[in-house]
Amino acid sequence: MRFGGMVGYLDVKRGNPLKKTKVLAVINQKGGVGKSTTVVNLSAALGEAKKKVLIVDLDPQGNTTSGYGIEKEELEYDIYDALLNDYPIEDLIMSTCEPNVFAVPATIQLAGAEVELVSLNNRETVLESVLLDIREYFDYVLIDCPPSLGLLTVNALVAADELLIPIQCEFYALEGVTKLLESMRMVKQRLNPDLDIFGVLLTMYDSRTTLSRQVAEEVQKYFGKKVFKQIIPRNVKLSEAPSHGLPVTQYAWLSKGSQAYTKLAREVIRRG
């Protein structure tokens, strides 16, 4: 099912620039924590709340791209071309099944970007420069970071206002978080002094297990008020939705997964 269609420069910039845009890097160096799931479903829920959202897929796996039904095999250009070939990002922006959500897609081509960025003088600030002219036309920009702390992730840290960190309620949940926070502090000192944590999101929570409850308590102790009150549960419909190229809010809007992301969107909006 293919929803993506090129939107174009004039459509993106239709209307007046918004007064304030929040750029959030959705990040965790561990894979399988619900990062792409969160980008897809939080963006959809924000869109349904009448917020204009741009998602930037910075993960070569392209799960956020396919999660919105965009056929990666049919794409001639992607975020790689904006980062390394000076391709205008406004010409990469695609429509999605949610009218208020737009996507800059990624394909496996992006896997080579880490090596190619090394040779650039401005290698850590390319994404920030690319987003500069269009960010103000959206309420939120959500960046799906790769599960690593390489140059693509550093670019996301520099471009972002704040970080949204998903942590799964499973064994070794906090493994690697210390390293992520060290990277954040380095970027904050050198390149992005205002960078901070917007929120920490508990995912894959199963209230039936002692482990989930213990991990939730541990994360709460570690991050305090940064932890969102809304927790994302383990949910079959949430797992099924990507194979249909739909956010769970459209695939199964009455499911627990859909309700959780809808409530999370409200909490995100309240935080400003």
Feature names for model-found ranges:
Residues M1-G272:
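P-loop NTP-binding core
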